[in-house]
Structures are given as structure tokens and as C-alpha cells.
Amino acid sequence: MKYELDKTSGNARRGRLVFERPQGTFSVETPAFMPVGTYGTVKGMTPEEVRATGAEILLGNTFHLWLRPGQEIMRKHGDLHDFMQWHRPILTDSGGFQVFSLGKLRKITEEGVKFQNPINGERIFLSPEKSMEIQYDLGSDIVMIFDECTPYPATFDYAKKSMEMSLRWAKRSRDRFDELGNKNALFGIIQGGVFEELRKVSLEGLVNIGFDGYAVGGLAVGEPKEDMHRILEYICPQIPADKPRYLMGVGKPEDLVEGVRRGIDMFDCVMPTRNARNGHLFVTDGIVKIRNAKYRDDTSPLDPECDCYTCKNYTKAYLYHLDKCGEILGARLNTIHNLRYYQRLMAEIRQAIEDDRFDDFVVEFYARMGKPVPPLQLADKS
């Protein structure tokens, strides 16, 4: 993988990731949003439908795919691309976030994490080395290091110890990745909670090890938005400019805009797909809660400005009807729309950066939703 930076507008960056795969060369235009395919599928969607929304890269979940179907079945198919029939780039997380979400079911040691398999109850062990081996079998185009996702709230001392262990695990991840002869990309993950000085130490340690890209982890875990913005404003300018920057697990449309304002290139989140299944649909001027009875006889399209299959063919009343009846098609049509909304948003962001009018775009984006523009806490790097 290589990263090409074309243009900046303030801190916002326009570029692309370029991947050489057996099927040819694939580009992922950045800033990019990655739909989440936890179990090797974006819920309810075929790969062709996901691609039709504009998605160029997907996220797969190492932890869940390790438990089911497992490495052996994955190897029998070739890799995750062959298993799910998506032959474009795939990024896989390391499994760290899911393991640490298990709470009392897991025990962290220097070696790794022992935990109870949530499927069958057996005790299993995940380490940096094991995570690299699983992701190698998945054929991930972008592999994430195994780290501890520092929870919120966390004291300075806890965040420091957690970050330092994540750095040691980063080196072990790098070493095992290289031993496997993996020719794909490996990203480091910056930790340190809401403490700027810890984030700086984490980044410096990762840069010394050397990675193909740098993710900001441990945000969107319950901290106030102001803290997330502050950490991004502080750390992004210090990340090597020739490497992509990935904000993990984020987020709402506003979060994507705010991330780009602060220099982020890549995002992933379950929000567009999960919200779609719950009847929360993103539109140009906010959110449509399709379960609201006022849409029962509404013959207008979901979003007149949207070019997705759902908006071109169906009314709000039909989507309301499908949801009310619990029809699977309702969830599918909602998902198509929400994923397309996110990809349209990213395309608009990329165009605004190209045209050097990203600041104007931000103002217009919030004006459409009737919201004020959140302030930047640090001065723009122009």
C-alpha cells in the first residue's frame, strides 16, 4: 500500500491509498469511510450492493472471524476476500477492542489477554503474535496492531501504563508481522486516553518502530466530544504527513466532518448500518426516524438530493410500511440509503478540499442541519 497526498485545505487532506492486489491496482480515495463487515458481511448487503453505494474498502473484525468461522475455514477459501467475495481492499481491526469490551470475562497480562469465548464459554488466549497470524490468514490489506483500548474514564496513571503496554505490544506486532513475511500494510494505534502528553509519547514510540499508517484509538469510547476534538487537534499535526491517519470507530456524520477538519483520512463505524436497521435514516438536513407515524402517508422520497436506489424508487410511506411489518426489505433499503449517504458525504468533502473551499463546506453542512459550527480549539495550520 502507498499513500498519495494531493492537496490540503487548512488541516483537511485530499489523497488516496493505492493497493496492488492479485486482481489489479485499487485506489481508495481519501478522506474515506469504511463500512463495517463484522462477520464477513455488511449486514443485509451483497458485495455488489455495498460497492454500488461508493464504498472502496471494507472493515472486517478479526476477533469475531477468529471465533467463527475460524482460521482453518478461512484458509480453505483462500482468505477473507475469497470467503465473502469482496476483492477490493479490506482493513481488519486487531481484536483488541472486542476483547477489552468483555469486561470481567477477560484477564490482561503482559503476554496478552485470556478470556472466555462468548460463544461456547471455553478459555482462549489472544496475543499480539496471534492477532498478526489471524490477520495474515484473513489476507487483510491493512493489518492493525494488537493494543489495549484505554477505557474512559481512566486516571493518568492507568492511561500511562496501558499506553506503555500497547507500545510493547506494537513492537511485538511489528516483529511477528515481519516474521510472517506479510507484504501488506501494518498500522500503529496511538493510545493515551484524553492526555495530550501520553498521546505524544505513544506516537513517538510508534514512529520509532515504523508503520505504514497511524490510527488514533481510544476515542469515541464515552469521552466528551470536546476531548476528542482536542486530542485530534493536538496529535494529527504530529503524525508524519506522508502516512494515512485513521480515526477508529467514528462516527456520526458530524464526527466525520470534524475529523477531516483536524486532518483525519480514514473512518469506520457501524452507525449507518445499525441505525438503518433501527429506522434512523441520515438525510441532507438531519435525521428521518421512519418509525414516526407522520410518515405513514408521506409519498415523498426519503431525501430528494440522494441518488441511491432507495430514494430513486420508494416513498417514506413505503419504508414506514416495511418497518411496521418487520419486513427484511425495509432494513435492506434503509441500509442502502444510509451507506450511500455516508459515501456521498465523503465525496462532497473530497471535492470541497480539491476546490479549496472546505471551510465553506463545513459552514453549509451545519447550516443545512440548523446547527452551529463547533469551534476549533487550536489554530488552523494553513
From Swiss-Prot:
EC assignment: 2.4.2.29
Top-rank lineage group of the source organism: Bacteria
Cofactor note: Binds 1 zinc ion per subunit.
Binding site for substrate: D93, S94, G95, G96, F97, D147, Q191, G218
Cofactor: Zn(2+)
Entries under HAMAP family matching the protein: Q_tRNA_Tgt
Complexes and interactors: Homodimer. Within each dimer, one monomer is responsible for RNA recognition and catalysis, while the other monomer binds to the replacement base PreQ1.
Protein name: Queuine tRNA-ribosyltransferase
UniProt organism field: Haemophilus influenzae (strain PittEE)
High-level lineage: Bacteria, Pseudomonadati, Pseudomonadota, Gammaproteobacteria, Pasteurellales
